[in-house]
Each structure stands twice: as C-alpha cells, then as structure tokens.
Amino acid sequence: MDKKKDISMSVIKRLPKYHRYLGNLMRNDVDRISSKELSEKIGFTASQIRQDLNCFGDFGQQGYGYNVSELYSQMCNILGLTKVYRTVIIGAGNIGQAISNYIGFEKLGFELRAIFDINPKLIGISIRDIEIRDIDYLGDYLRENVIDIGIICVPSNNGQKVCNILVKNGVKGIWNFAPVDLIVPEDVKVENVHLSDSLLTLSCLLNDIE
C-alpha cells in the first residue's frame, strides 16, 4: 500500500493494538462499537482513533460507529496479514528458541522455515520439527529459498554480519533482537526489539514514582 509511505510511524505503531482489541471484540460477539467505546477499551482518545483510521479510509458511520468484523478485516489488510511470510531465525539461544516455540506467529501467517546457529552443541537439534542448521550455510539456504523476514537473535558483535548476509540474498524484512542498530539499504525494513530499552523505560517510570 503506497499510501503507507505518508503515514507517520506513530500511527503504524498503534495498528497492532487495534488489531488485537478488535479480534477480542469479535471473539466476544461484539458487532459494532463507537470510537468512544473503543477509546475506553484501548486507551487512545476517540479523536485519535478517528484520525488514525481516517488515514486508511472511511470506516465508520456517524450514529452507528464501526462494524467490528469489517474493521478487523480491513486492519488485517492494512497490516499485511492476508499473506504468508516465510521467516528464518538466526541465533538459537534463549530468545531464538522462545520465538521458535511460539505458535502464535504462525496463526498470523509468519511461517518459520529454518533456524541457524553457530554453536555445535545446538546444530542438529530440532525445535518443533525444524532442525537447527550451521550458520555457515545461511547464505546457501537463502539463495535456494525465498525468505521474506530474517529474525536476528545473535550477540551484538555478529548482528551486522548476519544482517549483511540476509540483505545480500534478498531478504527485505528484518526483525532484530540483537542489541545493535543495523545499517541497511532503503528498501529493507528493520524493526528493532531492544529488550533492555523497554526494561530501562520501566525503571525510569518507577524512579519517577519514587
């Protein structure tokens, strides 16, 4: 969707929360909801909700509100959840194994195709019937298989090296858990998850309370 290029990142960051809450409403058989009611559940202002959704089209009707199932379907389209994304994990340590074992991602359309690691003790072990491969063969695997997203779960000193291999072999999406800011071409999208950043944010908030 070309229009996304003009949408602020702050709006895009809020979309998964809309998706999650709308899914919960559907499971609870809620057919329609006003922006005010959604505001009370999701924690955004009603005005913010209307502005966010208007970025992608006219979804609500005055006096009626939003049709929950239709809005959920549109949110899936906006988030790209109508396709299947082929993924690989590089780094089978604690974080890599936790992601590998989480089946919720597959329900959203993110299929795990392969896992790679440098540790001889891990190579050959299977996680959910996917055998951990030697990272030396990552490039060969990517040349032989189309992969959409690479999930980097390696130490910071290897993060950029792994990223370079992914980019060189056509991977356009990187979910980065390595504590390093990656350098990538403009056509490659990176989502960083620096766990310590989140924890330090919490510690700052706690410190402010005290």
From Swiss-Prot:
Q: Which InterPro entries does the record match to this protein?
A: CoA-bd, NAD(P)-bd_dom_sf, Rex_DNA-bd_C_dom, Tscrpt_rep_Rex, WH-like_DNA-bd_sf, WH_DNA-bd_sf
> What is the official name of this protein in its record?
Redox-sensing transcriptional repressor Rex
Q: How does it assemble?
A: Homodimer.
Q: Which GO terms describe its molecular function?
A: DNA binding; DNA-binding transcription factor activity
Claim: Transcription is one of the keywords in the record:
yes
Q: Its biological function?
A: Modulates transcription in response to changes in cellular NADH/NAD(+) redox state.
Question: Do you know which Gene3D superfamilies this protein is assigned to?
Answer: NAD(P)-binding Rossmann-like Domain, Winged helix-like DNA-binding domain superfamily/Winged helix DNA-binding domain
Instruction: State any GO CC term.
Output: cytoplasm
Q: Where in the cell is it found?
A: Cytoplasm
Pfam families for this protein: CoA_binding, Put_DNA-bind_N
Q: Per the database entry, where does the chain bind DNA? A: 17-56
Instruction: Give a GO biological-process term.
Output: negative regulation of DNA-templated transcription
Q: Which family would the database say this protein is a member of?
A: Belongs to the transcriptional regulatory Rex family.
Sites where the protein binds NAD(+): 91-96
Gene symbol?
A: rex
User: Keywords of this protein's UniProt record, alphabetized?
Assistant: Cytoplasm, DNA-binding, NAD, Repressor, Transcription, Transcription regulation
